[in-house]
Amino acid sequence: MDTTTLISRLEAASSSFHNLERQLADPDVAADPQRLETIARERSRLEPLVLDYTSLQKVEAEQVQAKSLLKESRGDAAMEELAQQELQELDRHHADLIQRITLALLPKDPRDERSVMLEIRAGAGGDEACLWAGDLARMYERFSSRRGWSVTPVSANEADLGGYKELILSVKGDAVFSELKFEAGVHRVQRVPSTESQGRVHTSTATVAVMPEADPVEVQIDPRDLDISTARSGGAGGQNVNKVETAVDLMHKPTGIRVFCTQERSQMQNRERALEILRAKLYERQLAEANASERSARRSQVGTGDRSEKIRTYNAKDNRMTDHRLGRNFSLDPVLEGQMDDVIDACIAEEQRGKLADLSEQAD
């Protein structure tokens, strides 16, 4: 990004920031909680960038002074050395600020701020694949807890020996998609199953889909396209188990997408959940089509984002997790405990490098 464009964007961000601060002082805004929250969130997003811009201006002024001092110190070896050291330090600080600001100004995915529907399906490997799907679910629940996100199961098809044939989790919080989007794809595990008496290593897979939540305005569903039926929900016991038809089985006829929702206590709640899942699945389809048409022109995407892409191998024997998109290994045990920060940070850094490469090509 050239200097003129950089400064222009910083000036625009600074102007927006100060305008938002004026709005926050407006009594009419204070009387509208929803508007107040929206403005406060946008102000918080811009604040680090504006502070860095202020620091950049200060450093550039100090660089001018340091260069002047260096020029005046010619002939005085001690003073010249001190001035040179100060200028070098200021140059390093300036370069760091430019790098940080450039990354902050890179194009943002508008979906990054959204909550997600996280779908985990057992793949190849039979019962062990179902257990592996359960392990992945726990990994994401622990990671989400560390982030302060809320996780709610919205649809679950449990396996007889444990784990899940299919599980859909609603993960709600700030910028969930910005981090979990890198999890979409096939996760392969190599380990000795607990049911294996000969100690042989088995390979199993589970598929993860990460669907940003879509609102009814973005994905409109014609009621005539739906087949909706009800069924009795199973449970752990009690008077209402299998007596009241609270489960909802929803079929979207144009796409053949089926959603079966049993987790809520009432039929109405399960119907709303099923529609929420369907909207997310339809939205994911739209995004996949858009990504496919754009992918050849972009370097910024980490992997394809497709649920069929083999993204990771988890090797229990060597306590190693390999991310094939990054070509890097990570310690397995911490990752399975939800300590995924290093992995996610590496994916974000790779995405940023790609965006910088895209910008450089556009500049050329």
Curated annotation (Swiss-Prot):
Keywords: Cytoplasm, Methylation, Protein biosynthesis
Molecular function in Gene Ontology: translation release factor activity, codon specific
Residue stretches of biased makeup (Basic and acidic residues): 306-315
Segments of this protein annotated with the region Disordered: 289-315
GO cellular component, one term: cytoplasm
N5-methylglutamine PTM sites in chain numbering: Q239
Post-translational modifications: Methylated by PrmC. Methylation increases the termination efficiency of RF1.
Family: Belongs to the prokaryotic/mitochondrial release factor family.
Protein purpose: Peptide chain release factor 1 directs the termination of translation in response to the peptide chain termination codons UAG and UAA.
Protein name: Peptide chain release factor 1
Species the sequence originates in: Synechococcus sp. (strain CC9311)
